């Protein structure tokens, strides 16, 4: 696999002119790289001056609205994959009819199916009344239930929830999670409300969603997002199970990200950040990509910067630190800190819990200037959308941008990064760890049993029986006078013998999902000569998978 990736990537670095004059050599190179009998590629291809990336979308406005931004990325991927989708249709239709069918389904995929806008009153603790605004967007129901988080923010808007819902559709498709995309937002600043008021808002919002059919284990399953967590998810589950879902045995599957006592799953809190780590790991250990960037594989000598020290930023920082990378700067909305010798994530977490801010952390200095432009190897924007724009993209010094947040890079900035040979690991792949583990939690709730409970003891006993069998076989063959030949397992194997916990199973499933999806993205990038344009490769994969569902299910009532 590594040789194939490395050699085929040489072609993706070729400029458009070189590719145009060597179309016959393209197939030869890919076949040769796979080990198939074919003529070796011409050396000139490997020496092309510039990489090639998708030019399917013309220049757009510098900072488009969020939903149009996602639509632009979708259009880029759709224009590249359209011919293949037409070619793969096995019908008796003419070429024109096939193309019309493909374009029709692509038009079905693109827009948001449903958007619910809500307003409801609450009485605050001081006796005053306030009207709360909220939204829930369901982008696609090609798979049900729909899946997407609920965020509490004063920046919530219809455009934002539509954009985030569409990203969820493509995100689920990229990592093969069988959900449609959705997103919700409540337009409040949670810091301005008491816990009692937040509970009122959350429970009332749940009831409004339920009345309109926008929540349910098989309909629409929310999850935590910005400024929400286990507590809010527990309120949602309890509200649904106590009212509209009181006859439904699967009622607690109406939401994920719950506390363990309410049907949650071990490993969900850190899932998105752990997914970010695994996503970076898959690309940073790929020698062919690192050679393009002029870097060595592995985390050992790498520095990184995190923008946003929330759930995603903290856990991303924690895992990268654990595997040898050094965090030299952390930024939040109220300021940034910097230490070239490294910042310990546990110490910074404890300091923030105690003081409410990272500013004043004794083992780092205040950082003047934009944290996004700090000198580092890996930049992790884990805050909010549209942080990297046309104006600051030329000054970004990182070689790898790992999108922990949703939509942190605008199309114009994305184009600049590609021209500057900077690798952007896209959001729809990189932060899919959360929805992946949410899927595991949803399955756990439907099965009504935790992972491994039925097999823990059986597997542990089987391992011990295997060791005893090996020991007895050795003693019969080599033992003298009935002497024993003890079999001593290593510490790592001893941990395995003791049986995998639910967290071990979740972590293993997440790592496998991220690795498999990364390989799919790499293969697609090579197939379409996209070079470092991993975002378009991810969108191509997502579009192909969603298209296949619509095409094979058939389009009803048209």
Swiss-Prot record:
Complexes and interactors: Homohexamer. Interacts with HADH; this interaction inhibits the activation of GLUD1.
Positions annotated to bind NAD(+): 141-143, 176, 252, 444
Name by which UniProt lists this protein: Glutamate dehydrogenase 1, mitochondrial
Keyword Acetylation part of the UniProt annotation: yes
Reaction(s) catalysed (UniProt annotation): L-glutamate + NAD(+) + H2O = 2-oxoglutarate + NH4(+) + NADH + H(+); L-glutamate + NADP(+) + H2O = 2-oxoglutarate + NH4(+) + NADPH + H(+)
Cited function: Mitochondrial glutamate dehydrogenase that catalyzes the conversion of L-glutamate into alpha-ketoglutarate. Plays a key role in glutamine anaplerosis by producing alpha-ketoglutarate, an important intermediate in the tricarboxylic acid cycle. Plays a role in insulin homeostasis. May be involved in learning and memory reactions by increasing the turnover of the excitatory neurotransmitter glutamate.
Top EC class for this record: oxidoreductase
Regulation acting on activity, per entry: Subject to allosteric regulation. Activated by ADP. Inhibited by GTP and ATP. ADP can occupy the NADH binding site and activate the enzyme. Inhibited by SIRT4. Inhibited by HADH.
Keywords: Acetylation, ADP-ribosylation, ATP-binding, Disease variant, Endoplasmic reticulum, GTP-binding, Hydroxylation, Mitochondrion, NADP, Nucleotide-binding, Oxidoreductase, Phosphoprotein, Transit peptide
Organism the protein comes from: Homo sapiens (Human)
GO terms of molecular function: ADP binding; ATP binding; glutamate dehydrogenase (NAD+) activity; glutamate dehydrogenase (NADP+) activity; glutamate dehydrogenase [NAD(P)+] activity; GTP binding; L-leucine binding; NAD+ binding
Modification sites for Phosphotyrosine: 135, 512
